[in-house]
Amino acid sequence: MFSLSSRFFLYSLCLSAVAVSAAPGLSLSLSGADSVVDVENLNVAATLTNTGDTTLKILNDPSSILSSKFATHTFDISSDNGSPAFTGVKVKYDPNYVVKKNADSSFTVLAPGESVTVNHALGAAYNFTGSGAASYSIEPSSLFYYVDPDTNELASINADTQQHTTKISGTLAVARRSNLGKRISYNGCTSSRQTTLVSAAAAAQTYAQSSYNYLSSHTASTTRYVTWFGPYTSARHSTVLSCFSNMLAYPYANYEYDCTCTESDVYAYVYPSQFGTIYLCGAFWQTTTTGTDSRGGTLIHESSHFTIICGTQDYAYGQSAAKSLASSNPSEAIKNADNYEYFAENNPAQS
C-alpha cells in the first residue's frame, strides 16, 4: 500500500505529465528556389506544423505567415551586404476584436501533427536595390496568436523556425504607384461610403488638432501622456508633438481613400513609403466615427505609418497592449501607431 504522502506525490506527477503533454507547440519552415532572377519571382512556401498535443485555433494575423493577402513585414531578410528596405503595408488589426467576433474564416485550426502551407510573394514587400544582388537568409516571424482552449481568451506562442537561403539577382525592386492628392478622392467607394469618409476625415482632423494643442500646452508629465507614451522626457514629448504636427501639415481631406479591400478582420492599411492613399477594409465600416478604435482614430493610426508623417510601427495592438508598451518600453511606444490613435481618441477621457 502507498502512504498518503506517496499517493500525493504520484498524483502530482500525473498532473505534471498531463500539463506537459497538453503544452502547445508550433514549428515553422520555409521552402523555395535556391536562386531567383528578378524579385517579382521571389516566392517562398511557409509550412506551419502543430507539434504539440492539443488542437490550436490560430488567428490568421496579417503579420503572420497564415495570411498572404497583404504584403506585410512577415520576414526578416538579410545578407552580408545588409537587409532590403521594407516597402509593403502596415495593417490595423485587433486580435481581441477578431476573437470576440469569432468568425470561422478568421482562424486556422490545426490538430496535433497537422500542417498548413501558405505561399508568399516577397517581391511585393521588399526592395533589394540598396542591399544589392546577393545570397539572402529569409526567416519568418515566429509570433502567433491563438485562442486558449481552457479560457477562450487570446494567447500567444512563438514557433520554432527554420530559415531559407536564396540568391537574388536581376531586377531588385517592383514598381508601385504613388499618390499625393490636393483634395479628397476615392477609389471603389459608394456614395454612402464617401459620405462616411468625409465624416471620418473631419474626425481625424479634429483628433490631430486637439492632440497637437494638448501637447503644445502640456510640457510636463500628465496622466494622459504617461498612459500612452510612458514616463515623460522632453525628447520623447518632442517626437510625439512632431508627429501630430506632421499630420496637420497633410490634412485628411487631401488623401485618396480606397474602398476595394474586403477583409472583414482588418480596419485599414497603407504603404508607408507611398504617401497619399489609405485603404479601408471591413472592420472600418463596422466601427463608429469617434471613440475607441473609431474611423477617425483609424485614420490617425494609418497616417502615422507614412514615412513623411511619423514612420510608426505596429509593436502592439489594442488598448491593453499599448498601455503595457508605454510602461515597459516608452521608446517603442512613441513609434507605435496604436499609441497615437488611443492618445488622440482619449477614450475614456484623461487630462
Curated annotation (Swiss-Prot):
It catalyses: Preferential cleavage in proteins: -Xaa-|-Lys- (in which Xaa may be Pro). The record marks Y317 as: Transition state stabilizer. Disulfide bonds join C189-C259, C261-C281. Its main location: secreted. Pfam families: Aspzincin_M35. GO terms for molecular function: metal ion binding; metalloendopeptidase activity. GO terms for biological process: proteolysis. Optimum pH is 7-7.5. Active from pH 5.25 to pH 9. Residues 1-22 form the signal peptide. Its cofactor is Zn(2+). The active site is at E302. Inhibited by chelating agents such as imidazole, alpha,alpha'-bipyridine, and 1,10-phenanthroline. Keywords: Cleavage on pair of basic residues, Disulfide bond, Hydrolase, Metal-binding, Metalloprotease, Protease, Secreted, Signal, Zinc, Zymogen. Residues 23-183 form a propeptide. It is found in: Secreted. GO terms for cellular component: extracellular region. InterPro entries: Fungal_M35_metalloproteases, Lys_MEP, M35_peptidyl-Lys, MetalloPept_cat_dom_sf. Coiled coil: none annotated. SUPFAM superfamilies: Metalloproteases ('zincins'), catalytic domain (SSF55486). The keyword Zinc applies. PANTHER family: NEUTRAL PROTEASE 2-RELATED (PTHR37016:SF3), PTHR37016. This is Peptidyl-Lys metalloendopeptidase. It comes from Armillaria mellea. The lineage of its organism: Eukaryota, Fungi, Dikarya, Basidiomycota, Agaricomycotina.
